[in-house]
């Protein structure tokens, strides 16, 4: 697989879970002998939702909730078959969304 590249994008709401998952992926790739670039922190997506506190009136009294989506990018350069096999077997938390390209 010379000259190839695997790009892994991680998304999660919890920054500690995504950092631990990225660290685990990098350790696995380095242990199998491939070179790795990253984890590169991508911009955090912030969604703000405005909700009226009262069920009937008092529109001036509002509450804001936000959801932050943290993202990381990891590039694996010149992966070996051993690297791909190790990545398939790695156990990551369910709260982390993994997209492999």
Curated annotation (Swiss-Prot):
A GO molecular function held by the record: structural constituent of ribosome
InterPro entries assigned: Ribosomal_uS10, Ribosomal_uS10_CS, Ribosomal_uS10_dom, Ribosomal_uS10_dom_sf
Keywords assigned by UniProt, alphabetized: Ribonucleoprotein, Ribosomal protein
Domain of life: Bacteria
GO CC entries: ribonucleoprotein complex; ribosome
Pfam family, one: Ribosomal_S10
Biological process, per Gene Ontology: translation
Subunit-structure text: Part of the 30S ribosomal subunit.
Family assignment from sequence similarity: Belongs to the universal ribosomal protein uS10 family.
Functional description taken from the UniProt entry: Involved in the binding of tRNA to the ribosomes.
The protein's name in its UniProt record: Small ribosomal subunit protein uS10
Organism annotation: Mycolicibacterium paratuberculosis (strain ATCC BAA-968 / K-10) (Mycobacterium paratuberculosis)
